[in-house]
Amino acid sequence: MIYSKIRLFTTLKFLTYTIFYFSGTGNTRWVAQQIAEAIGEELLCIPDLLREKRFEFKLEENEKIGFCFPTHGWQPPRIVRQFIRQLILVGQHSHFCWALTTCGDNMGEAMTIFNKELAANKALQSENGNPLQAETLFSVIMPESYVCLPFMKTDPIDKEHWKIENARHQLHHIISIIKDCKRGIVELEKGVTPRLYSYVIGAYFNKKMVTDKKFSVDADICTHCGKCSKVCPVDNIKGTPPTWLHNGRCTCCLACYHYCPVHAINYGSITRKRDQYYFNRRGDQK
């Protein structure tokens, strides 16, 4: 399982430094790992926590809370929003909280929406009633992985490398801010019309495009390797050739599409002539 290295909790735990993260094609996982290794934070994989129904965590007095996730349709992914609505942080009292989103070009108002989700969960309020808010916010540009709209494609290899090298340099700066618990730092690439991206296009995206009904597999090409079901973060794929369960849990991360070694999976017809991407696919990204 792609998330097998992340240690899960069997009971309520006292955490020291924690990053909750979700990643579909590996960009956000790599970013979260760079931060965790640099500051000694523990990575908690959101899909694993959802599988195990583990939502309650005890905070230490000086706990630092971090969230890392990709931008999906200029909004936080469905799976991240579902997790936040169930998260319980015992002892939350003005703890330093930061959040980072990865995106192909810009992220619109994804962080505004994310903070609204935090504020709406009363289980995240402090003892005096103040909501948990991510005060320090970052976006990191990473290689594009969304390919289901006419104007969106994967990046050429040279642009992939350029984005990752830029991200690597940016992360040194981000890590120093997190280490020092600097509040109120906002470094976001929102784009030219962020409200249009998130509240109009993004709303349509989440209503119409976040679905498994458009996925299909070419049975003549499928090698029955089972990779697609292994990488699905919501366990929405069974069997070989794969069958999508249509259970409403698909978060449209496109992991099944991108990780298929023979390009047997497609989303409608638009991806048939599109390339695939996941982090370190060719072994040249570390």
Language model regions located:
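FMN-binding flavodoxin-like domain, especially the glycine-rich phosphate-binding loop
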Residues: I2-T18, T25-V31, E37-L50, E56-F69, ...
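A generic structured-segment signal
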Residues: F20-Y21, C232
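A generic structural signal for alpha-helix starts
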Residues: S23-G26, D105, T223, T251
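Conserved short-loop catalytic and cofactor-binding motifs
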Residues: C68, T102, K159, A219-D220, ...
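A short, structure-level motif marking secondary-structure boundaries and short turns
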Residues: W98-L100, D212-K214, P241
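A mid-sequence, solvent-exposed acidic-amphipathic segment
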Residues: K190-H224, K230
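Iron-sulfur cluster-binding cysteine motifs and their immediate structural context
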Residues: V217, T223-L245, R249-T251, A255-R272
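Active-site-proximal loop/hinge segments that shape catalytic or ion-binding/gating pockets
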Residues: Y277-Q285
